[in-house]
């Protein structure tokens, strides 16, 4: 395996990389860096987490060291990704006098103009704000020799394809080296490549990455009204270190986040209406383990590069294969195992088959956990928490109450009663989620079939026949009967085929 120095990287940059813990290049870095140093256009197909920032960032540092003025422009789909890329570039170039400036919406443009006037070598930004600066002439393009588009398919999905074309047209073509990285290559991106890139060197690592068995993919069949309870049962059994949960709409994210918090889970939500300050706060909590569940829409999660995500839950099934690929790519990184679970209504199974056909691999059916498994998982979790609680000093007033209770009740009965309340506390919390219609059944051409209900209000959960808002559905059980270990499970329903999580662990 070649090291960075053998690829042509300077001692100063190699020293910075080693201080960051990077001893050897990743496959995409090994394949990209030599061509990037030669000024050859690069078309890289790779998912987030493969080291693609280093693939374009490391050689870029080599090219801009000692230069004056804006030498390179990097486009990213989101503010978070722009900030992450900029931070990595600063680390790569530590001590070499390279200035990196970020420009994106949601922040005062005057501050960005002031930073641009200082002549940074590298500008990283989102398409909309970059165009603002181009129109104001606060971003000069005459000295730019390297244009990089990171996660180009995500920018396209967010409606930036025309912005990308506008920006590429503004950078002088004669001296420009273009590097475009994308997890997928839809036709619009291919057209962009054909129009603006010069015989690019194609570097592809996506197929190997996505066939990597580090990510185990499951689906579980569940009706909409039972989805939330099934989901929280999985959370109790899986005990994810960090989990990202995907909802289809902003309302779904808000309601799902509130429901999880009311059940005692450490969760926060992200969607397009969240302010930049709040987004940064939520992401900081997630990265620092203050919360372990992040609920997000596809758009809000784009560009996030968070390590350590153990589970991805598709609470709502994605409408296309590309979204599915990006969702599950948030887990199973850096050699760690990941689990992706997709909740699917019986009439949505066509979407599962479409994803399987497109990716060339099957998902495993996963039966929802039994009540006994859920309670056992909760009990194990409570035992672990009790061990932590016992290591802390209790307040004197609580010790006084404890003494009074122990004098009045048998100690075993007292502890058992308290544990029972802790284990079953979640069951007493009522939550409300607005009913969401399943996706339309797909026809033979892969598109939603039929137009019978296109203009019909039948089945629309939002309004009743008098156009009054529905109250949605509740996850609270109608029966308040306590669970009895000897009680037989309902034999009237046929068990769903597939493995339980306990089977999976075996």
Swiss-Prot record:
Residues 436-506 are annotated as: Disordered. Changing residue 52 to A: Loss of RNA-dependent ATPase. Does not complement disruption mutant at 20 or 30 degrees Celsius, does not resotre biofilm formation. Residues 33-203 form the Helicase ATP-binding domain. It catalyses: ATP + H2O = ADP + phosphate + H(+). ATP binds at residues 46-53. A motif (Q motif) lies at residues 2-30. It comes from the Bacteria. PROSITE patterns: DEAD_ATP_HELICASE (PS00039), HELICASE_ATP_BIND_1 (PS51192), HELICASE_CTER (PS51194), Q_MOTIF (PS51195). SUPFAM superfamilies: P-loop containing nucleoside triphosphate hydrolases (SSF52540). Disruption phenotype: In strain S30, cold-sensitive; decreased growth at 30 degrees Celsius, no growth at 20 degrees Celsius. Reduced biofilm formation, increased hemolytic activity, increased stability of mRNAs of the agrBDCA operon. A double agrA-cshA mutation has wild-type biofilm and hemolytic activity (all phenotypes in strain S30). A motif (DEAD box) lies at residues 150-153. All disruption phenotypes were also seen for deletion in strain SA564. PANTHER family: DEAD-BOX ATP-DEPENDENT RNA HELICASE 47, MITOCHONDRIAL, DEAD-BOX ATP-DEPENDENT RNA HELICASE CSHA. A probable ATP-dependent RNA helicase with RNA-dependent ATPase activity. Involved in regulation of biofilm formation and hemolysis via its effects on stability of mRNA from the agrBDCA operon. Also involved in response to cold stress. This is DEAD-box ATP-dependent RNA helicase CshA. It comes from Staphylococcus aureus (strain NCTC 8325 / PS 47). The lineage of its organism: Bacteria, Bacillati, Bacillota, Bacilli, Bacillales. The gene is cshA.
């Amino acid at each position: 395996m070649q090291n960075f120095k053998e690829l042509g990287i300077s001692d100063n940059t190699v020293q910075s990389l080693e201080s960051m813990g990077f001893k050897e290049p990743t496959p995409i870095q090994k394949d990209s860096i030599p061509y990037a140093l030669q000024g050859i256009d690069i078309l890289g197909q790779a998912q987030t987490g493969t080291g693609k920032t280093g693939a374009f960032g490391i050689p870029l540092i080599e090219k801009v060291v000692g230069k004056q003025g804006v030498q390179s422009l990097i486009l990213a789909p989101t503010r978070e990704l722009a900030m992450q890329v900029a931070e990595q570039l600063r680390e790569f170039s530590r001590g070499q006098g390279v200035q990196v400036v970020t420009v994106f919406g949601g922040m005062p443009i005057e501050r960005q103009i002031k930073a641009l006037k200082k002549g940074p070598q590298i500008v990283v930004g989102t398409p909309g704000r970059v165009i603002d600066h181009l129109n104001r002439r606060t971003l000069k393009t005459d000295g730019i020799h390297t244009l990089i588009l990171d996660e180009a398919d995500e920018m396209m999905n967010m409606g930036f394809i025309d912005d990308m074309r506008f920006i590429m047209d503004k950078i002088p073509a004669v001296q420009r080296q273009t590097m475009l990285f994308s997890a997928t290559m839809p036709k619009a991106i291919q057209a962009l490549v054909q129009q603006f890139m010069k015989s690019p060197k194609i570097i592809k690592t996506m197929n190997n990455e996505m066939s990597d068995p580090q990510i185990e993919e499951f689906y579980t069949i569940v009706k909409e009204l039972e989805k939330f309870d099934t989901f929280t049962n999985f959370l109790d059994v899986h005990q994810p270190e960090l989990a990202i949960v995907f909802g289809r709409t902003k309302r779904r994210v808000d309601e799902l986040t509130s429901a999880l918090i009311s059940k005692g889970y450490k969760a926060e939500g992200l969607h397009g209406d969240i302010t930049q300050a709040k987004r940064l706060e939520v992401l900081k909590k997630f990265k620092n383990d203050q919360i372990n569940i992040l609920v997000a829409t596809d758009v809000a999660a784009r560009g996030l590069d968070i390590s350590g995500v153990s589970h991805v839950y598709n609470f709502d099934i994605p409408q296309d294969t590309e979204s599915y690929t990006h969702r599950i790519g948030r887990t199973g990184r850096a050699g760690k195992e990941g689990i992706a679970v997709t909740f699917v209504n019986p009439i949505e199974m066509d979407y599962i088959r479409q994803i399987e056909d497109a990716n060339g691999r099957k998902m495993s059916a996963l039966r929802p956990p039994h009540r006994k498994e859920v309670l056992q998982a909760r009990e194990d979790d409570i035992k672990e928490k009790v061990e932590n609680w016992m290591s802390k000093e209790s307040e004197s007033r609580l010790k006084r109450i404890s003494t009074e209770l122990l004098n009045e009740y048998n100690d075993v009965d007292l502890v058992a009663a308290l544990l029972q309340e802790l284990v079953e506390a979640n069951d007493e919390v009522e939550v409300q989620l607005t009913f969401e219609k399943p996706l339309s059944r797909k026809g033979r051409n892969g598109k939603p079939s039929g137009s019978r209900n296109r203009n019909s209000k039948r089945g629309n959960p939002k309004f009743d026949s008098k156009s009054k808002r529905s109250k949605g559905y509740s996850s609270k059980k109608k029966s308040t009967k306590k669970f009895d270990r000897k009680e037989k499970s309902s034999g009237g329903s046929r068990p769903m085929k597939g493995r339980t999580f306990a089977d999976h662990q075996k």
